[in-house]
């Protein structure tokens, strides 16, 4: 693998957080186990396999490597990536990619998905991302990755599996969804 940009690694339980951030220079992070990344101020070769990227805002230190990332995935014959970004920057980003396509003479295939605070994005049965508002000098959003699990409702605890199955088959919901934010090395404060 080409070692072209600095990457720091932090393990948190079963997840790895890799990337680098230096204000006004570059910011790029990924969680390889979830196959997703955050921001593309740089695009280390090791990040090329991430099919999903969430862009927080359009400052260059967070988005300058978008064309290189998209082109690299094309060159490696990978599926076009899905890029989530603030809805206010969608049109300009589409134009940017069209210009790069013309300059590079290579297609800039990717799925650009505009987001706004309050949106939820399903990653898998176990994980979802919610979009929240942030304050910055340009349109921006933040992203929170949630792990979700089904828990048996308290009123059914102590029943046999057959009893619970019969209740579920009668149409009654026997479980509820528990969401836990993936906070890296921080704890939530309520």
Label each PLM-derived region with a short phrase.
Residues 15-18, 109-112, 129:
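Generic structural signal for residues in well-ordered beta-strands
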Residues 66-72, 93-99, 144-145:
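Short, well-ordered amphipathic alpha-helices
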Residues 1-49, 142-145, 151, 180-188:
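Conserved beta-strand hairpin/beta-sheet module of binuclear metal-dependent hydrolase folds
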Residues 79-81, 86-116:
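Active-site neighborhood of divalent metal-dependent phosphoester bond hydrolases
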Residues 39-88, 114:
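Active-site metal-binding motif and surrounding structural segment of the metallo-beta-lactamase
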Residues 34-36, 108, 125-127:
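Short beta-strand or tight-loop elements
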Residues 23-25, 38-42, 68-71, 115, ...:
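A generic local structural motif
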Residues 116-190:
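Metal-dependent phosphodiesterase/nuclease catalytic metal-binding core
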């Amino acid at each position: 693998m080409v070692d072209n940009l600095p990457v720091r690694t932090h393990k948190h339980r079963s997840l790895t957080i890799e990337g680098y951030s230096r204000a006004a220079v570059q910011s790029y992070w990924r969680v390889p186990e979830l196959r997703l990344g955050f921001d593309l101020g740089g695009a280390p070769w090791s990040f090329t396999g991430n099919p999903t990227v969430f862009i927080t805002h359009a400052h260059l230190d967070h988005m300058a490597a978008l064309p290189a990332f998209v082109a690299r995935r094309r060159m490696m014959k990978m599926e076009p990536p899905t890029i989530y970004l603030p809805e206010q920057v969608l049109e300009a980003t589409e134009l940017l990619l069209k210009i790069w396509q013309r300059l590079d003479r290579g297609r800039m295939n990717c799925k650009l998905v505009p987001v706004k605070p309050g949106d939820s994005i399903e990653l898998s049965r176990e994980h979802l991302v919610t979009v929240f508002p942030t304050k910055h000098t340009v349109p921006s959003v933040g992203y929170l990755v949630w792990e979700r699990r089904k828990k048996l409702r308290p009123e059914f605890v102590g029943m046999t599996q057959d009893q619970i199955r019969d209740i579920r088959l009668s149409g009654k919901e026997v479980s509820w969804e528990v969401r836990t934010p993936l906070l890296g090395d921080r704890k939530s404060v309520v």
